[in-house]
């Protein structure tokens, strides 16, 4: 069908009490696309991820999913923390990840410290509460299945950052509570000396997938990632810079600067978009110009000897590109 940008259908929000109304904490919305039935994409909309750790009143999270049938939105299911107890309140992050964590052919939702099955039923909650960032992938290649790496704001949580089994919620690696808001966290393969993906956060600790501490000397940017040069490791993206981890010097070194551009999303300093747009598996980066007059897309000029199908053919990657466009 022709894409016009016109609204196809809509639903009114049911406005009610959402606990803590400090700032806009009760008005936090998320969206994603997920293959909940394993066959066709569904729309996922959510509200609420702050307040209400176990034993505290207030706070609410609702996730509603819809299919577009004959041009109309048809509700698939709705998850509401008011139907359960406090263990599911206040567990969300600034985005929800989409992945088939139990290998049943259908996507599940990783909602911060909470996981929701493709049928709308809760799978688990770690109870570690809200955090800004999370990454879901095969982070530890020595064990089956997917893992989640997440940082946490709650100082009463046991860990400031952790890596867990994405299906069961079992904590595999836990970072000591630092006593303050650990607001950034990132995980990917940046150090070729260690198998799997490394993890780092605002706590200033770089760990291997098995929990081995690689470095505590340097607080590395933990905002975003990018495949940019020709090797199979990931690069670190922060603000208008792309950098590469130097294991010998234990710091990142800038390899690209988007001159004349600016980042978006405040202190998160993101690009407008990072994705494999042109299909050679390295990723393009999109930034607004400083004067806001246009968007500029950059692509790498570095040759590579690796031939990999375009990343957009990986369904989890494609769904993640979609949900990265909300916060």
Give short role names for the model-derived ranges.
Residues 1-327:
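Beta-propeller-forming repeat regions
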